[in-house]
Swiss-Prot record:
Pfam families: DHBP_synthase. Pathway: Cofactor biosynthesis; riboflavin biosynthesis; 2-hydroxy-3-oxobutyl phosphate from D-ribulose 5-phosphate: step 1/1. D-ribulose 5-phosphate binds at R38, E39, D43, R151, R152, G153, H154, T155, E175. Mg(2+) 1 binds at E39. InterPro entries: DHBP_synth_RibB-like_a/b_dom (IPR017945), DHBP_synthase_RibB (IPR000422). It catalyses: D-ribulose 5-phosphate = (2S)-2-hydroxy-3-oxobutyl phosphate + formate + H(+). GO terms for molecular function: 3,4-dihydroxy-2-butanone-4-phosphate synthase activity; magnesium ion binding; manganese ion binding. Keywords: Lyase, Magnesium, Manganese, Metal-binding, Riboflavin biosynthesis. This is 3,4-dihydroxy-2-butanone 4-phosphate synthase. Its cofactor is Mg(2+); Mn(2+). Catalyzes the conversion of D-ribulose 5-phosphate to formate and 3,4-dihydroxy-2-butanone 4-phosphate.
Length: 215
C-alpha cells in the first residue's frame, strides 16, 4: 500500500498504532485496512467494552450491516459458541460462530441499542450460555490465538487493539461501504476517516508494532 496516503494519520506504523490505541482508550472508533492482496477492505472498529448505541448506529448506517463481535477462543468456549459451519471453506477462513441475541433486555434484537445490549451481555465477566439466545442479530467472530501475528485479519486486529488499550479482548467491527453499496477501499476509507475524525492504520502497522515491542 502507498504509505503516503496514510501520512495524515501518522508518518510511521508506530505513530498510527499509538494514535489508534489512544483513540480506543478514549472510546473512539478507528479504521483498519487489511492487505491489498487480501480483502482490501476497511473496517470501522470500536472497543466492545465501551461501544454506545450511537456508535453502533454509525456502524449500521455506513457499514455492510453485518456487525460482528470479535472475541477470543476462550470467550467462545465460555459462551459455548460453536462454529457457524462444521467445515469452513471460506477464502480467508473467517471464523464465524452461531449468531447471538441477549436473552434479556432486548426487543427484536435489531436496533442499535439492542445490539449493544447483546454485546455487553456476551462480554460480561460472568456471562454464560443461558444469557444468550441463538440465532440472533450479532455475529461473533473467533479470533485466532496470537492475534495478527497468527492471522492478519480485522478480527484479530480488533482484539489486539482492545488488549493494547487495556480493555477486554473484544472488538466490534463492520466493513465500510460506499454509497452505491460497493466496498470502500483505501482512498474512500481515508476520506471517510477525515470526514468523521477517525484514526487509520493497517494490519501491517499492527504486526510491525507488535514485533518491534515483542507484545
Amino acid at each position: 500500500m502507498n504509505q503516503s496516503i496514510l501520512s495524515p494519520f501518522g508518518n510511521t506504523a508506530e505513530e498510527r498504532v499509538l494514535n489508534a490505541i489512544n483513540a480506543f482508550k478514549n472510546g473512539t472508533g478507528v479504521l483498519v485496512l487489511d492487505d491489498e492482496d487480501r480483502e482490501n477492505e476497511g473496517d470501522l472498529i470500536f472497543p466492545a467494552e465501551t461501544i454506545t448505541p450511537e456508535q453502533m448506529a454509525k456502524l449500521i448506517r455506513y457499514g455492510s450491516g453485518i456487525v460482528c463481535l470479535c472475541i477470543t477462543d476462550e470467550r467462545c468456549q465460555q459462551l459455548d459458541l460453536p462454529p457457524m459451519v462444521e467445515h469452513n471453506n471460506s477464502v480467508n477462513k473467517t471464523a464465524f460462530t452461531v449468531t447471538i441475541e441477549a436473552a434479556k433486555g432486548v426487543s427484536t434484537g435489531v436496533s442499535a441499542a439492542d445490539r449493544v445490549t447483546t454485546i455487553q451481555t456476551a462480554i460480561a465477566d460472568n456471562a454464560v450460555l443461558t444469557d444468550l439466545h441463538r440465532p440472533g442479530h450479532v455475529f461473533p467472530l473467533r479470533a485466532a490465538n496470537g492475534g495478527v501475528l497468527t492471522r492478519r485479519g480485522h478480527t484479530e486486529a480488533s482484539v489486539d487493539l482492545a488488549r493494547l488499550a487495556g480493555f477486554k479482548e473484544a472488538g466490534v467491527i463492520c466493513e465500510i461501504t460506499n454509497d452505491d453499496g460497493t466496498m470502500a477501499r483505501a482512498p474512500e476509507i481515508v476520506e471517510f476517516a477525515k470526514k468523521f475524525g477517525y484514526s487509520v492504520l493497517t494490519i501491517e502497522d499492527l504486526v510491525e508494532y507488535r514485533l518491534a515491542h515483542n507484545i
